[in-house]
Amino acid sequence: MSNKNIVLAFSGGLDTSFCIPYLKEQGYAVHTVFADTGGVDEDERDFIEKRAAELGVASHLTVDGGPAIWDGFVKQLVWAGEAYQGQYPLLVSDRYLIVDAVLQRADALGTCAVAHGCTGMGNDQVRFDLAIKAQGDYTIIAPIREIQKEHTQTRLYEQKYLEERGFGVRAKQKNYTINENLLGITLSGGEIDKWEAPGEGARGWCAPRSAWPTDPLTVAIKFVEGEAVAVDGKPLSGPQILMKLNKLFASYGVGRGIYTGDTVIGLKGRIVYEAPGLTALLTAHRALEDAVLTKQQNRFKPHIARKWVELVYEGFFHDPLKTDLETFLKSSQANVNGEIVLETRGGRVDAVAVRSPHILTSKGVTYAQTADWGIEEAEGFIKLFGMSSTLYAHVNRSLRS
């Protein structure tokens, strides 16, 4: 069979390492793409490149996914200001940007064949497949799903498959399944999957309470039209801001939680997650919005935001409704300009100061203190504002009498 080009989303792990010889034996010339979304250091990037070469790929490409994940997801998530089911901040949404990198490479090679290493048991397969299908007429090959039709112990099968072909398997035993990127870390497996208390080993960036600094941390974040642009007065790119906030707030244990929720495929999922930088950004942005948006904006916007979050979580990243909702979210940010001061003493973060020319206040008015209207005006407002409830009570009280 003549070789056909196929582009594989590659991470260097067991699953995607297995995919390379498997696809080659199906007659494909395998081209790998590693989209670095912030979860590896330089040594790991080097390992991934060498691993791809060792396994015999036709070409390998490493893509800096930081700018894409900021512009394509983080900005919109912060505008939305919501988490999935009120808690989980969508930490594996880098999958959509990985798909974009894979499809760009496929288009450059003139092929419609793409592959990923997702299993047939989780959410990621849905996100990968829907994101691919939404962007063109591509052929999706998912080798791990294929072998699950015949093998129950797939990882053991993959390991044996590689060893039989002379490829080593990385001796890196992990008690947990870990996903790490610029957004944060998720951990599952072990006692987490057994609905038990996570052990101390189930920890990524966030320091335990015993290691928190004794002095409080104060950080100022500047926003322009809802986008963070500077930290403590220093302009930074989006990815730089998130990296800096991750480091600062992780040392105080901020952004760590245990989440149980409804997965795309209908099962209950349980993870430990850590998102120190995102937690800080969301806290600061929400405090600024509270001060500068109108009452009606602050009431209505969460409805839009929750739907946007649901679409992203469930794989509908390219659905037209998501684009429609983002148009509203972006419009709502026109006056979200200012600087928020955050403070943490460990475990949680609070917005302690707000500076903005758009704060909706009046020189002559301070809530519950002073006002530039008279007593009669206040009484008249209360009478009209509560008219419906007052009439209801009056009418029905008369009927009962």
Swiss-Prot record:
> What EC number(s) has UniProt assigned to this enzyme?
6.3.4.5
Q: Which of this chain's residues are annotated to bind L-aspartate?
A: T119, N123, D124
Question: Which residues are involved in binding ATP?
Answer: A9, F10, S11, G12, G13, L14, D15, T16, S17, A35, G117
Named in its record, the pathway it takes part in is: Amino-acid biosynthesis; L-arginine biosynthesis; L-arginine from L-ornithine and carbamoyl phosphate: step 2/3
Its catalytic activity? Answer: L-citrulline + L-aspartate + ATP = 2-(N(omega)-L-arginino)succinate + AMP + diphosphate + H(+)
A single Pfam family, by name? Arginosuc_syn_C
Give the matching InterPro entries: Arginosuc_syn_C, Arginosuc_syn_N, Arginosuc_synth, Arginosuc_synth_CS, Arginosuc_synth_type_1_subfam, AS_cat/multimer_dom_body, Rossmann-like_a/b/a_fold
Task: Check the record and name the Gene3D superfamilies matching this protein.
Answer: Argininosuccinate synthetase, chain A, domain 2, HUPs
Keyword field: Amino-acid biosynthesis, Arginine biosynthesis, ATP-binding, Cytoplasm, Ligase, Nucleotide-binding
Compartment list: Cytoplasm
The molecular function terms of the Gene Ontology recorded here are: argininosuccinate synthase activity; ATP binding
So what family is this one in? Answer: Belongs to the argininosuccinate synthase family. Type 1 subfamily.
Quaternary structure and partners: Homotetramer.
Name of the featured protein? Argininosuccinate synthase
